[in-house]
């Protein structure tokens, strides 16, 4: 085993680490959640990572987005993710798509993936992504943040969990996001994703919610 993955052992088996190197994961969004998800997957040793985002960095991203810095303001988020991938783990095949997830491209983006990570910032795109994953038979690991709170869930094909989390007419209540909420949420998502990729049991149809202000964790549905 390569030395860079040695500290995975004990938590993961050598066989599981080898399995991860043969997996492909799509990260939808390269901003607050996406940057941390990509970082964790790169260091974990997933073989191929695809990432899509049509946005560019602006000053309001600096408080929480791992890939944002004064030097990246105005540059594309997907391109910044690709540069980070080359720096952190050049052995990982990284495919960057400088476009938003849309009805036209969602099916192609998730095609051939073993898991999809939701790092989107709007409900409409989440619904599109959930439909594409269901049609492709790919597990979706949902994640969302707001202020002090973070949530994550595994959505398996055939389960309309996204529809239950965001019923028709739902709106995002706030754009507030603190520096520590995205990495906490990304850690939950990556842990769930790792269990799926390695064949470990994972509970589906549950929404895990963390309140970091009151230090409470609950499971809904």
Per-region residue spans from a language model:
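Conserved N-terminal Rossmann-fold NAD(P)-binding element of oxidoreductases
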Residues: 27-29, 52
